[in-house]
Structures are given as structure tokens and as C-alpha cells.
Design a protein with these regions (language model features):
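Formylglycine-dependent sulfatase
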Residues: 1-277
Length: 277
């Protein structure tokens, strides 16, 4: 961004920063604290800490669009970094997306029950859906009766994520998750049945979170089209790495197999390089 500033660009970063230092090289920055929270997150707006009510993906997009529309010098070229928290753990969907994909059954990956034979380092990773994915923190089984307990050390964190919601957010959340919690407690799942139940819950929430990102990327593209920016702007859509969606029995990304190593990237370059894969 500093080089772009020197070339006459206005620069901005909005959303996830997740570094110990304040951003430099930006004319405007409004960043989440740490990796941020999905609900009612705190932002640091050019040094000033503020809590904003709402859902992080929507808020981050709102702030970016506000800068594009109201806060930049429209006589200058710009570079905007729009960094979403989603789909970072713990994959908390927006309340409007909670019922999406409810009837979808996701195919279990062929390597889901990987035994890691001959691969000691892989066997020691703490991101196994069966043994490391927390029922409360990751899978939202924070029952009101406080009967579901876990051994990962993350249970209290999971309940705190719920407690930071507004009453309206909690009401929508409870409407969706309370019946799931009730059924889960009645089923008393173990073994393979529990493992695959956890996988389905993980996938449902992950895809809902991705849906919110997709919708908000669409909001930005719609704005750029309506404002006449779309055909004069290079757009890069990417991530910091791939992710495990049950392959090798894992969630997260911290092991360099193909699924984690591959990094998605799309570039829209009007009038530039011809599209290809």
C-alpha cells in the first residue's frame, strides 16, 4: 500500500487484520480486534475502539461500501483491502442464514477415517473432527440446562460467544439450535454415528457462513457496477490458504496436504489478461 500511496492512490483496509501492529500505508483503516467476533464485534477505526451491533460479514462490507461511497477522494485511484473474518472458526452463521441447506446431506470424504499409518506428525495434529471438535464451542450445543460438557477446554468460550448476542439475535439462534440440541441429547450418539453427526453439523454451519460471504461480495460488485467502477477496477478474490472439510478427518488448515496447500484465487481484470484457469 505504501508504494501505491506514492503513486497517488488512496488506500484502505477494512475487516480482519490479525497482526500485533497497527496498519501502516493506509489512508483509512477500520479493523477487527484480533480475528474478531461474528456477532457485535469490536473494530478499531483509525485508532478508536468501537463496538458495532450486527454480524461481522455484513458490518465489514458496510464499512467498505461507506468508504467507497463517502470517505474517499473520488478524483484519485484507490486500493481497498476488504478482509472478512468468515469463514474462520467457529463458523457462526448470520441469523438470516441459519436454516439454509438444512436438508442437505454432505458426502463423507473418502479419507475421513484416515488412521495416519506411517505418518506420526499427521497423527498428532489437534484438528480431528472426531476428538478435537468441541460440541459447544464449534458445534453450538450450548444447552440451557448446562448438561452438555466437553473436555477440550473450549466450552466456556463457546457459551461466551452466545452471551455476547443481543436478545433478538439470541431468539433467532435459539429457534434454530434448540431443537437440534434437544434431538442430539435424546439420541446419545457414539462412535461412527457421533463422528458423522459432527461432520454434518460442521459442514452445514460452514456453508452458511460461506453463503454470507458470497452475498456480501455480491453487494460490493453490485455497488461497483452501479457506480461505474466495475470496468475500471482490478478485483482479486483470494484466501490465505485452503481448508480441510473432513478430509483426513480434519477441520482447520495446519498441515500441508493438498487440501490445505491449494489456495483459491479469482482475478477480474477488465481489458487485461484473458480469463483462464
Amino acid at each position: 500500500p505504501k508504494l501505491l500511496q506514492q503513486a497517488g492512490y488512496q488506500t484502505a483496509v477494512v475487516g480482519k487484520w490479525h497482526l500485533t501492529s497497527d496498519p501502516t500505508g493506509f489512508d483509512y483503516w477500520n479493523i477487527l480486534i484480533g480475528q474478531g467476533d461474528y456477532y457485535n464485534p469490536y473494530f478499531i477505526d483509525n485508532g478508536e475502539k468501537k463496538q458495532i451491533e450486527g454480524y461481522a460479514t455484513n458490518i465489514t462490507t458496510d464499512l467498505a461500501l461507506d468508504w467507497l461511497d463517502n470517505k474517499r477522494d473520488k478524483n484519485k485511484p484507490f486500493c481497498l483491502l476488504l478482509h472478512h473474518k468468515a469463514p474462520h472458526r467457529t463458523w457462526m452463521p448470520d441469523t438470516c442464514d441459519l436454516d439454509l441447506y438444512e436438508d442437505v446431506v454432505y458426502p463423507v470424504p473418502e479419507t475421513f477415517y484416515d488412521k495416519y499409518e506411517g505418518r506420526i506428525a499427521a497423527s498428532e495434529q489437534e484438528m480431528n473432527i472426531i476428538k478435537d471438535m468441541d460440541l459447544v464451542y464449534d458445534l453450538k450445543m450450548a444447552d440451557k440446562e448446562n448438561e452438555i460438557h466437553t473436555t477440550t477446554g473450549l466450552e466456556e468460550n463457546g457459551r461466551n460467544l452466545y452471551n455476547r448476542m443481543t436478545p433478538a439475535q439470541k431468539a433467532a439462534w435459539d429457534k434454530h439450535y434448540d431443537p437440534i440440541i434437544k434431538k442430539f441429547k435424546e439420541q446419545k450418539l457414539t462412535g461412527k454415528a457421533l463422528a458423522e453427526w459432527k461432520y454434518q453439523q460442521y459442514m452445514h454451519d460452514y456453508m452458511r457462513v460461506i453463503h454470507s460471504v458470497d452475498r456480501n461480495v455480491g453487494r460490493v460488485l453490485d455497488y461497483m457496477e452501479k457506480s461505474g467502477l466495475l470496468e475500471n477496477t482490478i478485483i482479486v478474490y483470494t484466501s490465505d490458504q485452503g481448508f480441510y472439510m473432513g478430509e483426513h478427518g480434519w477441520f482447520d488448515k495446519r498441515f500441508m496436504y493438498e487440501e490445505s496447500f491449494r489456495t483459491p484465487m479469482l482475478v477480474r481484470f477488465p481489458g487485461g489478461v484473458k480469463g483462464d484457469i
